[in-house]
C-alpha cells in the first residue's frame, strides 16, 4: 500500500540524509550545519558540488564507509486514511438478445495526493474492466462430474477492449492529514466501484418491469430469460 510503503520509505530517507550530512560536509570541506538536502541533492554554501543520493553513496563506497549504505527506519501511522469516490455506469440492454452494454462510465475519486497520476488512472481503468467482466461476462461452468468446462479463454469470457466504454476519470485531491505524504491510496477502487455501478445500472433499467433482482454474471442468455419471464418487449 502506498500509504504504508511510501511513508516507511520517507522515514528511511530522513535517516539516510541525516547520516550522510556529516560525511558530505567532510567531502565538501564545510561545517555540517552548512549542508542541506533539497530537491534530491546535498548542497552547501560556497560549493558548486551538489551530489545526489546515488553520487553520495558512490563517494561513501570509495571512502570505505559501508555503514552509510544501509539504513532502516520505522514509520507508524497513528490513524488510517480512507479514499472515497463515486461511480456512474450508463447501461443499455437489448431485450431481443439479452446483450448488456455499458455505453458510458464516469468516476470521481479522492485518493489524496498522487505519486503518479497517469498510473493511477490506468489502474482505475483496469479495475473497471475487471469489475465489468465479473458483472457481465465472466461465468464459471462445471459439468455434472465436477469437470471445469470454462477452463480456457476460448470459453471463459474475460472483458475485452470492445467491452469497455469511454471512461471519464477525475481525482478530487483532498490530502489526508494522517500521513506526511497526504496520500490515501487507490488499491482496488476501480473494481469495487464497477461491480456495484454496473449491476445497479442494469437493475435500474429493468426495475419498472417488475424485476427487482439481477444476479452476476449478467450474460445474454441469463438476461434474455429474465426479460422473457417478465414479458419485457423491445421498446
Residue ranges of predicted features:
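Cofactor-binding beta-sheet edge motifs in enzyme active sites
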Residues: 1-235
